[in-house]
Swiss-Prot record:
PANTHER family: ATP SYNTHASE SUBUNIT B, ATP SYNTHASE SUBUNIT B', CHLOROPLASTIC. The keyword Coiled coil does not apply. F(1)F(0) ATP synthase produces ATP from ADP in the presence of a proton or sodium gradient. F-type ATPases consist of two structural domains, F(1) containing the extramembraneous catalytic core and F(0) containing the membrane proton channel, linked together by a central stalk and a peripheral stalk. During catalysis, ATP synthesis in the catalytic domain of F(1) is coupled via a rotary mechanism of the central stalk subunits to proton translocation. The lineage of its organism: Bacteria, Pseudomonadati, Pseudomonadota, Gammaproteobacteria, Pseudomonadales. It is found in: Cell inner membrane. Keywords: ATP synthesis, Cell inner membrane, Cell membrane, CF(0), Hydrogen ion transport, Ion transport, Membrane, Transmembrane, Transmembrane helix, Transport. GO terms for cellular component: plasma membrane; proton-transporting ATP synthase complex. One of its GO terms (molecular function) is proton-transporting ATPase activity, rotational mechanism. F-type ATPases have 2 components, F(1) - the catalytic core - and F(0) - the membrane proton channel. F(1) has five subunits: alpha(3), beta(3), gamma(1), delta(1), epsilon(1). F(0) has three main subunits: a(1), b(2) and c(10-14). The alpha and beta chains form an alternating ring which encloses part of the gamma chain. F(1) is attached to F(0) by a central stalk formed by the gamma and epsilon chains, while a peripheral stalk is formed by the delta and b chains. Belongs to the ATPase B chain family. This is ATP synthase subunit b.
């Protein structure tokens, strides 16, 4: 193989080209690559942080959902207890009212019975006096009549 001037000239030109590239072309390319690498690393870090934040948010939402369900169950249980209590109170009030109405009706019946008995006594007394007058054939005066009625009423 012959080394001639063309090969040396091409080698010198190539060396100048390499030095030129190392001096002027290579630094901006390296800077651009480093910036791109930094952006990619920052993006990956941001994605990791976002994934962690999402995980924490999902845990927090799950916890809040469990708490809300527990609160809802507690409210429902309290409502059921309150409803049962209201039913018991209404039942007790109805029983008390029924007892009161029953006692009032019983008192009215007693009062009516007594007034009917008194009226019946008076009628029986009048009938007895009328019958006695017919039997005796004479009239009895008012005072004697009242006295007889009272005696009969007391006996009846």
């Amino acid at each position: 193989m012959n080394i001639n001037a063309t090969l040396i000239g091409q080698s010198v030109a190539f060396l100048i080209f390499v030095l030129f590239c190392m001096k002027y072309v290579w630094p901006p390319v390296i800077t651009a690559l480093q910036e791109r690498q930094k952006k990619i690393a920052d993006g990956l870090d941001a994605a990791n942080r976002a994934a962690r934040d999402l995980e924490l948010a999902q845990e927090k939402v799950g916890q809040q959902l469990r708490e809300a369900k527990a609160q809802a169950a507690e409210i429902i249980e309290q409502s059921k207890k309150r409803a049962a209590q209201l039913v018991d109170e209404a039942r007790e009030q109805a029983r008390v009212e029924a007892d009161r109405v029953k006692a009032q009706a019983q008192a009215e019946i007693e009062q009516e019975l007594n007034s009917v008995k008194d009226a019946l006594r008076a009628q029986v007394g009048a009938l007895a006096v009328g019958g006695a007058e017919k039997i005796l054939g004479a009239t009895i005066d008012q005072n004697a009549h009242a006295e007889l009625v009272n005696k009969l009423a007391a006996e009846i």
